[in-house]
């Protein structure tokens, strides 16, 4: 009664699977059965009930784990001796589909139903351990041999100890370790709020841990979603230049994937304020969700030589990111050309977080800088190699033209799905047409190159 929380149905189900089951359990007695009366009496006499740690869908979760433990035959399986090593292997085997240790991060990654996330502080892993401890008690009750059952109940009781859980969780780290590079490998999978979209094939499938995705977009995929106001907004900020608007749509759609073949960065440049680029960028970042990241301008700024032993968190945070936004760098910022070449050149990057190990990753991110001031460039090869692309925002919205609620409007779920469709359309156009620059983009980029050349 204690371990089942007074749930007579669960008590009956477990008792029938145990070695204590006898035929008299089903004997009719006093208008009921011997078993039902026994359970009722046990619940009535119970002074307290066990309160499981995992309350959500507890019965289903316990039943699923109980069945897994039975299939693994954990009490008699030589893989799981009744010690720290065996307990570590059991934890790793029980949760290998949803919990894996990442040595570079010195953390477990846990699947939350939509994506794999780092278990900061080990809290989610500890909850899994508590749930497994609860299931082991129920498993012990299914053992038919009385002596064996008693011994295994004593062993499973150890799992309720925090110190013991910490020990076997630590032992489990080495069983199925996974490298950072094994996550987010499919650069065309876009993990949406309601499933995963393959941007190459158009196929849409439910979330699954087997995809090994650590990011999720901020929008649900609805192929029928439309937002005429956003379409009109794009035309407005591009001053009615359809070719420039089409190119901008392709540049933003490019950010949906992890494909970096074009090896360039985009400057959304407007010398005047109130030109719409901030609203456009924030709306896109909202749709991108985890795939988008706001990056400090200092990340691309020239600076004194840094100690290679120092953490490179600005770069480490870009692992798995596809849309990196740098907003409004200061006037007079000097671009770190070597850093830009590294970040846009498809080379493997190495980075580390504070107090963690370093790791390598292939960049999937594209750089988008929205600014009123273009940074100083001294290395003209950034232009000759096509790494710098300027998309001009020439429109200035007067006060009477401004819509104060536009950002809120575009962040609504229905609008976010429509903007996602617009981005997908942009990526489709990019595949079909390539990145040929319209006159406005060519002229703006050439002007920037000319001004930079004079400064050299």
Task: Report the location of each language-model feature.
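Modules that initiate DNA replication and primer synthesis
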Residues: 1-71, 105-141
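Feature primarily recognizes SF3-like P-loop helicase cores of small DNA viruses
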Residues: 62-107, 134-456
């Amino acid at each position: 009664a204690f371990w089942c929380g007074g749930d007579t149905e669960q008590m009956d189900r477990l008792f029938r699977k145990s070695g204590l089951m006898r035929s008299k359990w089903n004997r009719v007695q006093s208008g009921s059965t011997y078993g039902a009366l026994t359970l009722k009496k046990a619940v009535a006499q119970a002074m307290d009930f066990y309160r499981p740690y995992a309350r959500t869908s507890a019965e289903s979760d316990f039943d699923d784990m109980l069945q897994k433990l039975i299939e693994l035959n954990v009490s008699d399986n030589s893989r799981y001796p009744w010690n720290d090593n065996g307990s570590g292997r059991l934890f790793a085997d029980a949760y290998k589909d949803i919990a894996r240790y990442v040595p570079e991060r010195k953390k477990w990654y846990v699947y939350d139903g939509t994506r794999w996330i780092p278990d900061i502080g080990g809290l989610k892993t500890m909850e899994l351990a508590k749930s497994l401890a609860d299931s082991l008690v129920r498993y012990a009750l299914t053992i038919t041999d009385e002596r064996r059952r008693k011994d295994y109940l004593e062993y499973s009781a150890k799992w309720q100890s925090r110190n013991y859980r910490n020990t076997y969780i630590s032992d489990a780290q080495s069983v199925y370790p996974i490298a950072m590079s094994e996550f987010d490998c499919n650069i065309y999978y876009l993990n949406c709020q309601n499933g995963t979209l393959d941007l190459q094939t158009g196929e849409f499938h439910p979330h699954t841990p087997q995809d090994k995705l650590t990011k999720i977009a901020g929008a649900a995929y609805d192929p029928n979603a439309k937002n005429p106001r956003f379409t009109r907004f794009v035309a407005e900020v591009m001053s009615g230049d359809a070719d420039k608007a089409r190119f901008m749509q392709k540049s933003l759609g490019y950010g949906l994937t992890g494909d970096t073949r074009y090896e360039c960065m985009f400057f959304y440049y407007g010398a005047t304020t109130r030109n719409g680029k901030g609203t456009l960028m924030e709306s896109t970042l909202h749709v991108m969700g985890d795939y988008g990241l706001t990056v400090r301008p200092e990340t691309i700024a020239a600076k004194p030589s840094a100690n290679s032993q120092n953490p490179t968190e600005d770069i480490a945070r870009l692992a798995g990111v596809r849309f990196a936004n740098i907003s409004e760098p200061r006037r007079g910022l000097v671009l770190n050309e070597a850093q830009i070449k590294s970040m846009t050149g498809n080379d493997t990057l190495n980075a580390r977080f504070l107090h963690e190990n370093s790791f390598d990753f292939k960049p999937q991110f594209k750089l988008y800088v929205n600014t009123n001031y273009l940074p100083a460039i001294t290395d003209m090869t950034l232009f000759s190699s096509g790494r710098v692309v300027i998309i001009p925002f020439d429109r200035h919205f007067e006060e009477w033209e401004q819509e104060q609620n536009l950002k809120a409007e575009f962040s609504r779920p229905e609008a976010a799905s429509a903007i996602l469709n617009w981005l997908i359309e942009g990526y489709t156009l990019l595949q079909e047409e390539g990145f040929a620059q319209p006159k406005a983009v060519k002229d703006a980029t050439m002007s920037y190159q000319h001004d930079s050349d004079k400064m050299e």
